[in-house]
């Protein structure tokens, strides 16, 4: 196999930087076009970074505070991480009738994990949508992962997670409500008004949701397995920041 010298490679990259296409570069320097293509592309290993928690190699992620906070809400409420042979898989379960919620949640996963497999499946005769992503570092990103159901064990945010939720509280609330919340019309006598509801079996997750609401000046009403927000100004702010499920 013939190996071209570094001066040829440097000359090729200089021509590419000037906007010359691969075919013309190959013709001028007398090298195969595929060689020019390989020189132009960064090596595949450069697509890897280091996990900030376990320090093992991982494909680069693209989390901003708002995206992570929203995905954390989706995961805590109706997400599950499971171990596979060589990686981990996170599944998020959503009601398929809310097509915009499902589409936007899938786009969120693809945005956060641009180099990892992301997909969608419909189950239960199409009534439930399952979004999934594969990564060996999901339990690093979501340390609430553990054996058994979340409502059967303690759930608490780590300090770095709390900082993100405090920086992007509305995104976190949006993830929770889109996963297992609702907007409904409350009727009391001759009065009708909108209310937001959020339900979960885990008292710890309800605590996190409630405290996030309180930090934003909202006035939630706590029940055993649910939280409601029905004051007019609170609902107006939630409509502006969270929206409705559709």
List each model region and its residues:
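Internal intein/HINT superfamily modules and their associated LAGLIDADG
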Residues: 1-246
């Amino acid at each position: 196999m013939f190996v071209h010298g570094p001066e040829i490679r440097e000359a090729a990259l200089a021509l590419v930087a000037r906007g010359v296409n691969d075919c013309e570069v190959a013709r001028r320097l007398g090298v195969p076009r595929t060689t020019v293509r390989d020189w132009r592309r960064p090596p595949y290993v450069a697509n890897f970074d280091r996990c900030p928690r376990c320090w093992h190699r991982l494909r680069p992620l693209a989390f901003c505070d708002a995206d992570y906070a929203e995905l954390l809400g989706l995961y805590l409420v109706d997400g599950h991480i499971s171990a596979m042979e060589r990686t981990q898989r996170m599944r998020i379960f959503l009601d398929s009738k809310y097509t915009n919620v499902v589409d936007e949640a899938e786009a969120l996963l693809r945005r956060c994990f641009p180099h990892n497999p992301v997909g969608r499946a419909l189950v239960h005769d199409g009534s439930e949508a399952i979004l999934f992503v594969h990564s060996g570092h999901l339990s690093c990103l979501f340390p609430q992962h553990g054996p058994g159901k979340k409502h059967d064990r303690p759930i608490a945010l780590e300090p770095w997670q709390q900082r993100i939720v405090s920086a992007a509280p509305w995104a976190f609330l949006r993830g929770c409500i889109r996963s297992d919340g609702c907007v409904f019309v409350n009727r009391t006598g001759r009065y009708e008004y909108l209310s937001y509801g959020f339900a979960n079996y885990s008292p710890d997750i309800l605590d996190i949701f409630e405290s996030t609401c309180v930090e934003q000046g909202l006035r939630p009403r706590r029940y055993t397995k649910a939280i409601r927000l029905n004051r007019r100004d609170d609902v107006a702010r939630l409509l502006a920041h969270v929206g409705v499920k559709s």
